[in-house]
Design a protein with these regions (language model features):
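Active-site donor/metal-binding and catalytic loop motifs
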Residues: 1-2, 207-232
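Non-catalytic, C-terminal membrane-associated alpha-helical segments of glycosyltransferases
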Residues: 2-21, 35-37, 253-316
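Short, acidic, metal-binding catalytic loop of nucleotide-sugar glycosyltransferases
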Residues: 48-57
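Glycine-rich, basic loop-to-helix element that forms the pyrophosphate-binding segment
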Residues: 86-102
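Conserved nucleotide-sugar donor-binding
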Residues: 103-104, 162-177
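Short aromatic/hydrophobic "clamp" motif used to bind/position activated sugar donors
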Residues: 107
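Conserved donor NDP-sugar-binding/catalytic core segment of glycosyltransferases
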Residues: 115-152
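Acidic donor-binding loop at a coil-to-helix junction in glycosyltransferase catalytic cores
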Residues: 185-195
Length: 316
């Protein structure tokens, strides 16, 4: 049996490179939405990259949650720029309100700690047009100059939705609702919306042409609000996993599969994230798990209790 490297042979799309996109030629307005929190230095690089885009018909909406808010930062940019201060530190609220305020049918979500090439907007629009898709999910890299991972190196139906690099039709939100605010300050809000879009028949294409460098800086953003890893609580007596993880799982996959999900993931989660993949420490965690068992059980039941409250309060 011959082994085939599907990522390099089976899914080539040479006609994309020569495709003359009618959508791109029509130059529709694109609304780029950026929530920000305590990252003016990085946001400046973001706006400079947008100034250098080869596609020019776009507006930028910045929802600033920084303390102290510096209105002077927004002067002198060569952009169609709108901004406002949001007192509450809330990512999904910021995105929902900015989407509602957007003037365009095309909404492009972006992060405040990322870098992009000059053809970023163009490639998103071209992909939407070429595949007659509803969503273009760009690729995110963590290192400047890094090679795109094989499973993201070709066009395909996307199995993720990254709200730091994705283009939507605004009408999708009118149809299936906005981001679920019960994920605020927690995890998987973008994944839940992606699942909702998929179940409602929207075509989401993984787009290797629209890549970004996600710097994942330590200051500001969601990490400042106390959430980074869905399985490793920040506080000793915090729920494990983050309640929104179980909320998502129970909402879409039910109680039984969520229990299997816990059994599969809970022991590896004891190992700190920076040591993830260390085989020796992983074995040590498995050997010492009985010592942690009562404490872990408390964390899991606490998370389950909180996710139950979320299920009772869900609006979608």
């Amino acid at each position: 049996m011959k082994r085939v490297d599907y990522s390099r042979e089976a899914f080539e799309c040479p006609e994309y490179d020569t495709f003359e996109s009618p959508l791109l030629k029509s130059q529709p307005l694109v609304s780029i939405i950026i929530p920000t929190l305590n990252r003016y230095d990085y946001l400046a690089d973001v706006l400079r990259d947008l100034e250098r885009q080869d596609y020019k018909n776009f507006e930028v909406l910045v929802v600033d949650q920084t303390d102290p808010f510096q209105e002077s930062f927004y002067q002198e940019w060569s952009l169609d720029l709108r901004y406002w201060y949001q007192e509450e530190k809330a990512l999904w609220k910021a995105r929902n309100e900015a989407i509602q305020a957007a003037r365009s049918e095309w909404v492009l979500l972006y992060d405040d700690d990322s870098r992009i090439d000059s053809n970023w907007i163009s490639e998103h629009l071209k992909t939407i047009d070429f595949f007659q898709a509803d969503i273009s999910s760009g690729v995110s890299l963590s290192v400047v100059g890094a090679e795109i991972p094989k499973h993201y190196s070709y066009f395909r139906w996307s199995d993720q939705l990254d709200t730091g690099n994705v283009l939507f039709k605004k009408s999708i939100f009118d149809d299936i609702g906005y981001f679920d605010l019960q994920f605020e300050k927690q995890r998987m809000g973008d994944g839940e919306f992606g699942m909702r879009a998929y179940l409602n028949g929207y075509k989401n294409i993984s787009n290797p042409k629209a890549k970004r460098i996600h710097l994942k800086v330590s200051q500001g953003g969601l990490r400042q609000m106390g959430s980074w890893d869905g399985w490793r609580p920040k506080k000793l007596f915090g729920p494990r996993p983050v309640p929104s993880v179980l909320y998502f799982s129970r909402k879409y996959f039910g109680r039984r599969l969520s229990i299997f999900f816990l059994l599969h993931s809970i022991i590896p989660s004891i190992l700190p994230y920076k040591y993830k993949g260390n085989r020796i420490l992983t074995v040590l965690v498995f050997l010492t798990f009985p010592l942690f068992f009562p404490f872990i059980v408390f964390q899991v039941f606490y998370s389950w209790y909180l996710s139950t409250a979320k299920l009772k309060n869900q609006h979608n």
